[in-house]
């Protein structure tokens, strides 16, 4: 089931490359919350995901084929995201 993303960033060709999921500040971004969001967003086929509650932020690079993800140390810049390379 596909739903509207909170924020969806596109590359220069209009392809989606980053989804940002925004939670309320009082919602803690636990491993369970993050896992639910990343699994849900595999349906978009987007290589990057950010989850934030406005206080805490997590970024990940997804591997759609393997249905896995790698947490990143920081949110990548736009040029990195559109290269679609690790």
What are the residue ranges of the model-derived segments?
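Carbohydrate-associated surface elements
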Residues: 54
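A short, conserved, highly charged catalytic patch centered on acidic carboxylates
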Residues: 1-48, 57-86
